[in-house]
Amino acid sequence: MINALPPNHSDTVRRIVADMKSRPGPLLEVLHAIQSELGYVPDGAVPLVAQGLNLSRAEVHGVVTFYHYFRRTPPGKHVVSLCRAEACQSMGADALAEHAKRKLGVEFHQTTADGEISLEPVYCLGNCACSPAAMVNGRLYGRLTPERFDAMIAERGQKK
């Protein structure tokens, strides 16, 4: 499970832990900060976080693996987040998700073989009036159809 981190990643993790360890219950905040800076929470960060926060490796690993939000591998160049909430489901999000998986050749929480696109589920983007919705690299899309999804992906240089 534990892999060595590059020195620059180790320094980043140590800095984040040092900056936040005095806050009450800092583990989630620390993990979010690590993912924000590195794009994911590497397995090699677990012992550094555990040591810095005086927790067991099992406690830190348990939190990282419990919350689907935390990535344990580097994300693709583009992150496509498909809304899975009820409003979007009622407007065809399930069919859109199946189309996206086929189009990209991945399941949720996976990245295309070329490292370009990661497909992630989210539970409400706040765009319910324009469902089904997705977000790509922070840009919100609404009223998606399979055709509009394909065009959205093509904008990213992904022409499958």
Regions flagged by a language model, labelled:
Residues 1-160:
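Signature of N-terminal electron-transfer/Fe-S-associated modules in redox systems
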